[in-house]
Curated annotation (Swiss-Prot):
Organism phylogeny: Eukaryota, Metazoa, Chordata, Craniata, Vertebrata
GO biological process: defense response
Protein name listed in UniProt: Peroniin-1.5
Arginine amide, modified sites: 7
Organism this protein belongs to: Litoria peronii (Emerald spotted tree frog)
Tissue: Expressed by the skin dorsal glands.
Keywords per UniProt: Amidation, Amphibian defense peptide, Pyrrolidone carboxylic acid, Secreted
Length: 7
């Protein structure tokens, strides 16, 4: 995934 809403 290129972006996640958490790290």
């Amino acid at each position: 995934q290129p972006w996640l809403p958490f790290r």
